[in-house]
Amino acid sequence: MTNTINKPFNATPAYLEHHIDRGQGSIYVRDYEGSEPAFVLMHGFPDNLHIYDDLIPHLVAGGRRVVAFDFLGFGYSDKQTGARYSYEQQLSDLHAVVEHLGLDKIVPVAHDASGPAGINYAIDYPEHVASVCLLNCAYGVAPTKKTPEIIGLFAHTDLKSYTQALLQSPEQFEWALKFQMSKFLEHMKDDSQIQYLANFLGPIIETNFTKHPTSTPAFVQMTSQLFEEVTRNTKRLPEMEALDIPFKLIWGDHDPYLNTGVAEDFHARLKNSSLHVLPAGHWLQIDIPEQVAAIMLSNE
């Protein structure tokens, strides 16, 4: 199903909506007109496509086609009872978007936990990838990478009885989410960025976990597979290193978890990459969207 949404000038540009059937529900997609290769924007664990709301107008103003979508189980995409979520499913979601929209070559833009989808898509479908853009994301092992506390809690499956009990108490789970956000915010330097991020991102994450049906099953299933996925991706590092596709690494340097050391490790491993470290936190596309867009649109 496809329809057009028009928004006021200076708000989000006009886009087409798509709902792509994945067998256990449909993916929600927004497609903004422009020249190709299209930027295909992907989100991480606790959020959804809205993390790109401030970035997209700059990319569209630069004349480029932009596609943003919610992985199954998150945001506006379906969250069917009994649905199974995995990193392989997210990679397939990306492939389904490319096929449904008839895109030839794309620029996967990966943030946070969508790093595996973006990088593995480049490995598996290099003929469809013009370049790759990585924003404070993870893939395999990296010497300085740290796991956020709430992610580590749910990733340790031997703590399942504890995390299941936590989920039975909305107040305690909300406290855990707010604690994690505070850990990201305390490493940021710019007070205006801190305030804006808290006001912008807080409702996005809250809606993901409080509006029914919620993203909680997808979050729980994805985090429980994290360590196995890191192991699988570490084995694929030689395939990543062999890619001759250009990579842009755009990194907020105030991220205590997926820190600049992670970006430097990517840069050292990749055959064809540029590294851009910016004064921002983990969600740099929210903190400094104009600067991020300028690098994405550049010919470097």
Residue ranges of predicted features:
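Flexible "cap/lid" subdomain of the alpha/beta-hydrolase fold that forms the substrate-access gate
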Residues: 2-19, 25-29, 46, 51, ...
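Typically the conserved alpha-helix immediately C-terminal to a functionally engaged Cys/Sec
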Residues: 54-58
